[in-house]
Structure formats: C-alpha cells, structure tokens
C-alpha cells in the first residue's frame, strides 16, 4: 500500500523531525510512505476573509498538484468525521480491499484546507474539535497510521 501525507509547511523543530523519522521507519514495514511538504503562504495579521481564502486557494493548488488521480484522498478537517483508532484501521483496510492502493492524507496550513481540496476528498476526517499546530499534527497522523497497521496485522498496540 502507498501512503502519501501532503501537508502545508516545513517541519523546523528537531524533536518533531525525530518523531516523524521514527514513525516513518516503523511504517516502512507496512507501506510505502511518501511525505510531501508544500509551501505555506504568509498570512498577514489582519487578513480579511477574502485574503484568507486566496491564501487557502494558493496552498490548495499546490496540494492538488501532488494528488494522483487514483488516490483515495482523506482530508484532515475540523468538520470531518471523528472515529476511533479501530475504525480508522477499518477505513485503511477498506481502501485496500476496494482496490485503492494509494491513500493521500492532506493536512492544511494554519487556515485549513481550500474548498477545492475538500471537494477532491473522498473522506473528511477529524481527530478532535480542538485545533492543533499542523506540524505536530503530522506526527499525530503518522502515529495513528502506524497504530492502524498494527491493528490490521493483529499486533499488540498501546490502548
């Protein structure tokens, strides 16, 4: 299975890079992982709604360029569906069983995802109603993908 994580912005903090590297190494046993970072646009402090939408569109266009036609796209969005780790593993397994061997997870920038990206998504997923820094969220997503594969393989995982 091919897993892509397409996210806005670069990881600068060493501790986050170390966690991403660790989960990437662990996941190599289960899937081919591709992490794609697109440039985040600068948001002025007093940006209008129109300016924010333009920024989301620019970031969205960069994201869409990296989504393959055959990808099952899962957008991480506050308005998405909240599910358990077991349900998340079922979602990944259902993709595989229905012939979707490529899953693209999409993480937006500080303003979220554009309507174009959300429209392209096959599934909208929320981890919580809380807001997280998108850099930290990448680590959280990798951990849940790793946990999902452990569940699917019947291997022990921390509950």
Curated annotation (Swiss-Prot):
It comes from the Bacteria. It catalyses: pseudouridine(1915) in 23S rRNA + S-adenosyl-L-methionine = N(3)-methylpseudouridine(1915) in 23S rRNA + S-adenosyl-L-homocysteine + H(+). Keywords: Cytoplasm, Methyltransferase, rRNA processing, S-adenosyl-L-methionine, Transferase. One of its GO terms (cellular component) is cytoplasm. The keyword Transmembrane helix does not apply. It is an enzyme of class 2 (transferase). Its EC number is 2.1.1.177. It is found in: Cytoplasm. GO terms for molecular function: rRNA (pseudouridine-N3-)-methyltransferase activity. Its main location: cytoplasm. S-adenosyl-L-methionine binds at residues 76, 108, 127-132. Pfam families: SPOUT_MTase. Homodimer. Specifically methylates the pseudouridine at position 1915 (m3Psi1915) in 23S rRNA. Belongs to the RNA methyltransferase RlmH family. This is Ribosomal RNA large subunit methyltransferase H. The lineage of its organism: Bacteria, Bacillati, Bacillota, Clostridia, Eubacteriales.
């Amino acid at each position: 299975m091919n897993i892509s994580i397409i996210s806005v912005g670069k990881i600068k903090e060493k501790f986050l890079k170390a966690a991403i590297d660790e989960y990437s190494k662990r996941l190599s046993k289960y899937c081919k992982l591709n992490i794609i970072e697109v440039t985040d646009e600068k948001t002025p402090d007093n940006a209008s709604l129109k300016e924010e939408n333009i920024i989301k569109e620019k970031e969205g266009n960069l994201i869409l360029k990296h989504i393959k036609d055959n990808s099952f796209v899962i957008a991480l969005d506050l308005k998405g569906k909240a599910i358990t780790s077991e349900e998340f593993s079922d979602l990944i397994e259902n993709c595989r069983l229905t012939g979707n061997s490529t899953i693209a997870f999409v993480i937006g920038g500080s303003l979220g995802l554009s309507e174009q990206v959300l429209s392209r998504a096959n599934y909208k997923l929320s981890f919580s109603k809380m807001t997280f820094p998108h850099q930290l969220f990448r680590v959280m997503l990798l951990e849940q993908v790793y946990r999902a594969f452990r569940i699917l393989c019947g291997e022990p995982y921390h509950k």
